[in-house]
UniProtKB/Swiss-Prot annotation:
It holds the Pfam family zf-C2H2_6. The N-terminal non zinc-finger region mediates the repressor activity. SUPFAM superfamilies: beta-beta-alpha zinc fingers. Interacts (via SNAG domain) with LIMD1 (via LIM domains), WTIP (via LIM domains) and AJUBA (via LIM domains). Keywords: DNA-binding, Metal-binding, Nucleus, Repeat, Repressor, Transcription, Transcription regulation, Zinc, Zinc-finger. InterPro entries: Snail/Krueppel_Znf (IPR050527), Znf_C2H2_sf (IPR036236), Znf_C2H2_type (IPR013087). It comes from the Eukaryota. One of its GO terms (biological process) is regulation of neuron migration. PANTHER family: TRANSCRIPTIONAL REPRESSOR SCRATCH 1, ZINC FINGER PROTEIN. A zinc finger (C2H2-type) spans 191-213, 222-244, 248-270, 276-298, 304-327. Residues 148-172 have a biased composition (Gly residues). Disulfide bonds: none annotated. This is Transcriptional repressor scratch 1.
């Protein structure tokens, strides 16, 4: 904590005001009450007696008002603690200065851990409450005796009955069979595709993936009204329809784009900005996708291999450039190799 936030000197009991002191002195002399050695009234003054005007009855030699802590609380500590002196202050070094001031130079800032200022949000509390609610039924079912499930008179026997009249057992078995379908979550909580075996974390992602297994001749396939391209995946078709709506236009060259981030990346070609740099070699790129493609060149996995010289490449575009090099033009005195086969878009 900065030192500017620390209070250097604070006056304790020396508040002085001429008007307040004079008014207090006049009232003290009018009452005629005895004073304590520290300057305050030692006896309790009954307000009813003062208001009635009885000066002699104004001084009540009765006990003082009730203390802040009840006597029963003090008695619980034992008879030895009841008459003991109050404990000393825990920080006596702060009040050693003369005149009743706190010595701010001797004060030390208290340090707190980060957990002391951490306040959990509603999601953490809801997660904890849901976890507790889920643990309660499992604990109750584990603690139930085995005799309750065998047809006893309780509600547990009726819900878990396995006989012909046990509706609970029949419905539970049907639910288990329904959950054990081809798209159900496995042991690891993943949802597997029944056709290709690919797994997904959520059932919605699995249902979206299943659209890719549809045939182009299926009734669920949709055709683009602009270009006639057929799609079996509705999210893919929705993204394709945006390519026909070129509403984002470059103000420099007039080129239009379907998405604003594509226009933003295009503007870097005019400004020369390359904010995406490679951490391995320092090469910079204007687009993040180009950086991701470049990062594959530093990977140990190079899946594209030249059929002649057996040289491997991480990107297919690098392999195509290698096909156009001297290796396939009969360089180094060797015979010219045949042109690389043209792959269809599906094989690519």
């Amino acid at each position: 904590m900065p030192r500017s936030f620390l209070v250097k000197k604070v006056k304790l009991d020396a508040f002085s005001s001429a008007d307040l002191e004079s008014a207090y002195g006049r009232a003290r002399s009018d009452l005629g009450a005895p004073l304590h050695d520290k300057g305050y009234l030692s006896d309790y003054v009954g307000p009813s007696s003062v208001y009635d005007g009885d000066a002699e009855a104004a001084l009540l030699k009765g006990p003082s008002p009730e203390p802040m802590y009840a006597a029963a609380v003090r008695g619980e500590l034992g008879p030895a603690a009841a008459g003991s002196a109050p404990p000393p202050t825990p920080r006596p070094e702060l009040a050693t200065a003369a005149g009743g001031y706190i010595n701010g130079d001797a004060a030390v800032s208290e340090g707190y851990a980060a957990d002391a200022f951490f306040i959990t949000d509603g999601r953490s509390r809801r997660k904890a409450s849901n976890a507790g609610a889920a643990a309660a039924p499992s604990t109750a079912s584990a603690a139930a005796p085995d005799g309750d499930a065998g047809g006893g008179g309780g509600a547990g026997g009726r819900s878990l009955g396995s006989g012909p009249g046990g509706r609970g057992g029949t419905r539970a078995g049907a639910g288990t069979e329904a959950r054990a379908g081809p798209g159900a979550a496995g042991a690891g909580g993943r949802h597997a595709c029944g056709e290709c075996g690919k797994t997904y974390a959520t059932s919605s992602n699995l249902s979206r993936h299943k659209q890719t297994h549809r045939s182009l001749d299926s009734q669920l396939a949709r055709r683009c009204p602009t270009c006639g391209k057929v799609y079996v995946s509705m999210p893919a078709m929705a993204m394709h329809l945006l390519t026909h709506d070129l509403r984002h236009k470059c103000g420099v060259c007039g080129k239009a784009f379907s998405r604003p981030w594509l226009l933003q990346g295009h503007m870097r070609s005019h400004t020369g900005e390359k904010p995406f740099g490679c951490a391995h070699c320092g090469k910079a790129f204007a687009d993040r996708s180009n950086l991701r493609a470049h990062m594959q060149t530093h990977s140990a996995f190079k899946h594209f291999q030249c059929k002649r010289c057996k040289k491997s490449f991480a990107l297919k575009s690098y392999l195509n450039k290698h096909y156009e090099s001297a290796c396939f033009k009969g360089g180094a005195g060797g015979p010219a190799a045949p042109a690389p086969p043209q792959l269809s878009p599906v094989q690519a």
